[in-house]
């Protein structure tokens, strides 16, 4: 017999009663998720039910059947490749590695911890539950405009659970065995360290990350804040390939300021005709600090983050390289929120000259789908079996580049508004550590955010869904 232990069980689930950065009774914690006995928490780190399977040692015939079953369950297939609408001349996403693309510059923006329902559930064309909405169009007008002007992605899922594995998934196409097995302990307050983002060599991906892949394939690259700590890169591959002035994760620095630093660097590189082919940019203030007294409110943090994203798209849209540019934006994970489909469903955006306009795409995509699409554009092979098997985002692109007339929408709320209410939830926020993302109990953090923004409305409970397959009715 084979005894197979599976720490993640058979499925993820929805979590309408998941964490919330605006719930008054909830702590916002970075790198931690300890729970009190009896807590009914739909925190992503606690949704998985481990399993033990006892199966006969498979025969050769069994292995063939098992392999076919696995292949059938993989979203990507050769048949789907053949169905991709890529026959038009000039289609920008190659079907195979080393085919040329008219897109010459890729910008990859990484944000922090939001679910789809928290931000975009108020867009009627998408599959959203507005009862879980926290940061709707009034707070995130730029992201709404981007989603509605380009492609609304309402079936996008992050591959990771938390930031520890999330940044490694986002940059490397997987998190290694050490990291996957240790983050539950460190986040649960039972010992261990963060490890991710290059913090510990043992937690790094064996063959490196997407920057290593760029180096191996002669693709120029630069990082703004991603895998950078205290002003220094955490990976040797980023030496001489990062902005020394761009702030790394620090909630005391606004994302709007980060944009200004990036813009100055971008303009100088543009003038020299030396803009790298691949650029990673970190805008992480949508993480928020809960109700911490004297610190920006959750709404203020998210509005600041949204404005930075809007300014970023405006700058690229007005630049001479727009028609040769593709922008991909995602969250590293979706742990700090609720979603009625799945705790991994998150916001994602695609923009650029060749990106379709006013289009809704219900295709199931994941973090590795985005990675695979960028790899195809840049003429690089997949890094792992996960991005190799992911469905590329072909449906999001068109064969003709178009301009995009856009000016960033100024925040509709005061981004300097700070938390002033003194209550037990504000007091809990004072005890939290925001020096690094995910250093706190995320369930408590989400409850603080939820009740802080929603008052006494009951905290939303979990759903299991590997992917959602929309029907015509949907």
Language model: regions and residue ranges:
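Conserved beta-propeller blade signature
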Residues: 2-4
């Amino acid at each position: 017999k084979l005894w197979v232990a599976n720490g993640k069980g058979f499925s993820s689930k929805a979590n309408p009663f998941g964490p919330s950065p605006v719930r008054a009774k909830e702590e916002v914690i970075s790198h931690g998720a300890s729970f009190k006995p009896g807590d009914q928490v739909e925190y992503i780190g606690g949704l998985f039910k481990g399993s033990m399977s006892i199966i006969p040692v498979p025969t050769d015939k069994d292995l063939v059947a098992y392999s076919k079953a696995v292949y059938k369950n993989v979203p990507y297939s050769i048949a789907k490749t053949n169905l991709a609408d890529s026959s038009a001349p000039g289609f920008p996403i190659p079907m195979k590695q080393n085919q040329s693309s008219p897109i010459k510059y890729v910008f990859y923006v990484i944000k922090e911890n939001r679910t789809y329902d928290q931000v975009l559930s108020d867009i009627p064309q998408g599959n959203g539950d507005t009862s879980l909405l926290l940061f709707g169009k009034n707070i995130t007008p730029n992201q709404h405009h981007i989603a509605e002007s380009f492609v609304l992605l309402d079936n996008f899922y992050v591959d990771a659970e938390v930031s520890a594995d999330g940044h490694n998934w986002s940059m490397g196409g997987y998190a290694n065995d050490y990291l996957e097995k240790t983050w539950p302990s460190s986040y649960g307050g039972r010992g261990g360290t963060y490890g991710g983002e290059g913090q510990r060599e043992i937690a790094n991906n064996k063959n490196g990350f997407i920057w290593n892949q760029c180096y191996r394939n002669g693709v120029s690259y630069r990082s703004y804040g991603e895998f950078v700590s205290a002003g220094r890169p955490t990976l040797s591959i980023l030496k001489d390939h990062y902005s020394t002035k761009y702030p790394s994760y620090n909630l005391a620095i606004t994302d709007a300021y980060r944009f200004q630093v990036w813009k100055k660097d971008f303009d100088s590189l543009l003038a020299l005709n030396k803009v790298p082919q691949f650029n990673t940019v970190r805008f992480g203030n949508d993480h928020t600090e809960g109700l911490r007294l004297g610190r920006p409110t959750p709404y203020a943090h998210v509005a600041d983050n949204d404005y930075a994203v809007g300014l970023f798209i405006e700058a690229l849209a007005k630049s001479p390289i727009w028609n040769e540019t593709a922008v991909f934006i995602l969250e590293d994970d979706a742990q700090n929120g609720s979603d009625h489909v799945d705790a991994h469903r998150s916001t994602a955006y695609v923009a650029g000259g060749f990106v379709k306009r006013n289009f809704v795409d219900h295709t199931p995509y994941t973090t590795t789908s985005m990675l695979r699409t960028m790899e195809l554009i840049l003429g690089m092979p997949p890094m792992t079996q996960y991005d190799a098997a992911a469905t590329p985002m072909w449906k999001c692109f068109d064969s003709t580049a178009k301009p995009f007339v856009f000016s960033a929408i100024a925040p509709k709320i005061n981004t300097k508004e700070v938390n002033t209410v003194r209550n037990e939830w504000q007091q809990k926020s004072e005890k939290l550590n925001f020096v690094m993302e995910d250093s706190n109990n995320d369930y408590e953090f989400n409850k603080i955010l939820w009740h802080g923004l929603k008052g006494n409305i009951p905290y939303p409970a979990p759903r299991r869904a590997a992917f959602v397959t929309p029907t015509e009715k949907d």
